[in-house]
Amino acid sequence: LLVDLQRFCNGLKLFLNDSIQPQNHIACFVLKFKPFHVLLQPFLKFFMMKKILKQLKIAKINPATSTGEKWMESKSDLIHSISPVDGSKIASVRTTSRAEYDKVVQSAGKAFESWRLMPAPKRGEIVRQIGDELRKFKAPLGQLVSYEMGKSLQEGLGEVQEMIDICDFAVGLSRQLYGLTMHSERPGHRMYEQYHPLGIVGIISAFNFPVAVWSWNTMLAWVCGDVCIWKPSEKAPLCGIACQQIISNVFKRNQVPEGVSCLINGGREVGEWLSHDPRIPLISATGSTRMGKAIGAAVGERLGRSLLELGGNNAIIISEHADLDMSLIGCVFGAVGTAGQRCTSTRRLIIHEKVYKKFTEKLVNAYKQIKIGNPLDEKNHVGPLIDKDAVAAYLQAIEAAKAEGGKVLVEGGVLKGKGYESGCYVKPAVIEAKNSFKIVQHETFAPILYLMKYKTLDEAIAMQNDVPQGLSSAIMTLNMRESEQFLSHAGSDCGIANVNIGTSGAEIGGAFGGEKETGGGRESGSDAWKVYMRRQTNTINFTNKLPLAQGIKFDL
């Protein structure tokens, strides 16, 4: 390390006390030679990220395709993972070829034959060990999520914790894959229903939660007896490589067959192979509404199942009876967390006219305190958008809102200069708008918050529901009647409806998903496991007669 430092600093001699421990050399060097601090920063960042990649077994160029412990080597095209944090290339991943894809599906199909016969609690035990393995790698994996995707380090670590939590949930679930018993109208008969493993589950995940959404699907599917093929986002492929490397440790110890956990990489074409493949009974896809419609149509054409978790256009209603200070935290985090790139990010605030001015002033002042910068620095609240295409969409949305008559309360814009070299850092914007604006009806994956007023709760709920999407919603109120109306049949039409918390940050114990153009799918907790299984009704006759249902007579 010292030799590398000297080379990096053009042979500068290092004068260090022998008592200084090697791991402190960098820190001591920076302290002794403060003028060189700026020079050393890129070296230090490179060194730390190199260490993280080594821990996660990520090479400079990585194979695209794996069936568990084994990887398929090829010379296919490369996907370059570019960090939005600083614009650096982290590493590269090969793309999966059609021949490799077919080998993966064959391997998964063969593995399913034995995996489904393993008792569910034993599959749960393997998932428990995966949770423990994730605990060991929480720090480096969380840092990779933050660096490759751009979310804050706290959110990156939180995403890995979500993986651990779903493992814990799935372990308990493995002993509770319950059916039902029913009473038969025929004497001497017993009826019940049970659930069987479905088969191969194809998982297409998005960049904004590059590891958590995979785990929501995979851990449940595994305890249900399914095998999985995962295509991570081409914008965050290294997170997929890292997860496959982590779980391979557990699979090796437990002699899990190749094909239970498969990884493929590539762009739209690879996703289309999954969607059109009749060997894959279920496709779980997370992404834009446009993508979901294409996948839903492809899977539906072959009468397969699709679990779609698509866009959101989430609103918080701020009642005149709200605790405004508490509401402020939920609104600001919901709008700017992950730089507005959560499907549950808060896009709209529907504020009662009596508190509109007061709350808006609080909001504008809060936005002045937001720190934007390198997400690996825990002092910063907001990191970058994923890439320059996202930045362009953000800028276009602001201009569209202005063109429709929106009033900008907090100016947006792209940040430039030191620390913002990637060109992906933007300022969270706040705009007064109308719910009917075309741009407000559209989900923009960026930190743009639209404000609007209401007079009555009926009006507020109507505005909340009057968008094509139906994922998450919330009301801030201390009035029980208002909260109950919001949660009633005449209230929010979203899959998630909260009271006195924001729209983002769902816990894994509840089913996650939404209605309308959000896709209708449910993942994670509650009884979401049922989508990964096939339901079977059984009737058993334990008499010496064969009576027919509905009293039909058929004598021979």
Label each PLM-derived region with a short phrase:
Residues 89-96, 111-117, 203, 316-319, ...:
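Short, well-ordered beta-strand elements within core beta-sheets of diverse protein domains
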Residues 90-177, 188:
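Glycine-rich loop-to-alpha-helix module at the N-terminal edge of alpha/beta enzyme cores
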Residues 246-249, 290-435, 457, 462, ...:
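ALDH superfamily catalytic-core signature
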Residues 179-326, 454:
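Rossmann-like NAD(P) dinucleotide-binding subdomain of oxidoreductase/dehydrogenase enzymes
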Residues 48-86:
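Hydrophobic face of amphipathic alpha-helices that form TPR/SEL1-like repeat modules
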Residues 86-91, 255-256, 280, 317, ...:
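Conserved C-terminal structural/oligomerization subdomain of aldehyde/semialdehyde dehydrogenase
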Residues 87, 123, 145, 167, ...:
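Residue-level signal for inorganic ion chemistry
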